[in-house]
A protein has these predicted regions:
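Conserved hydrophobic/aromatic beta-strand scaffold that supports enzyme active sites
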Residues: 38-42, 60, 81, 89-91
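Glycine- and acidic-residue-biased ligand/ion/polar-headgroup-sensing regions
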Residues: 55-74
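A short hydrophobic beta-strand segment most commonly corresponding to one strand
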Residues: 60, 104-124
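A generic "binding-loop/recognition-motif" signal
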Residues: 47, 56-57, 96, 104, ...
């Protein structure tokens, strides 16, 4: 027990590369089981993710470097575009349709719930180009760590 009366000590986890991605690199910085995770995302200029939403994952992005074009549903079925710059924050709760495109090489910090493999692609709903990339996952494929 520490002097503050708790059986708790700081942890200093090692970063772990999730592996190279088509769009750049994803590095898992910290994973607190059943609570949250933090990642570093390096996204190459011109890279574009699929138009998607998450069933369970709640995520926040902080733009550290570069400019990112975000497309999102305004809640009325319309896709809106917004440019995020260093210091800007984007919050994507479960069900929020969104797509990212790197206008420059980007470095982003992502904090989110621990729902890996939670992705529903929805380009066809909005009549936009279907990109290559990771497909929709089923609810059974979502992994919570």
């Amino acid at each position: 027990m520490n002097k503050a009366g708790f059986n708790s000590t700081p942890e200093f986890p090692k970063s772990e590369s999730v592996g190279p991605r088509e769009w750049g690199e994803e590095i898992l910085v910290s994973l607190v089981p059943e609570k949250f995770m933090m990642k570093k995302l390096y996204i190459n200029k011109g890279s574009k993710g699929g138009l998607q939403y998450h069933r369970k994952k709640d995520e926040v992005h902080v733009i550290i470097k570069g400019r990112m074009l975000i497309k999102y549903d305004d809640g009325n079925g319309n896709l809106i575009e917004k440019i995020l710059e260093p210091g800007d924050v984007g919050h994507y709760p479960p069900g929020a349709v969104h797509q990212e495109e790197a206008l420059e090489d980007c470095f982003i910090i992502e904090a989110s719930t621990n729902h890996f493999n939670d992705r529903v692609r929805c380009e066809e709903l909005y009549g936009v180009e279907v990109l290559d990339g990771l497909p929709t996952t089923t609810e059974e494929e979502i992994v919570e760590k």
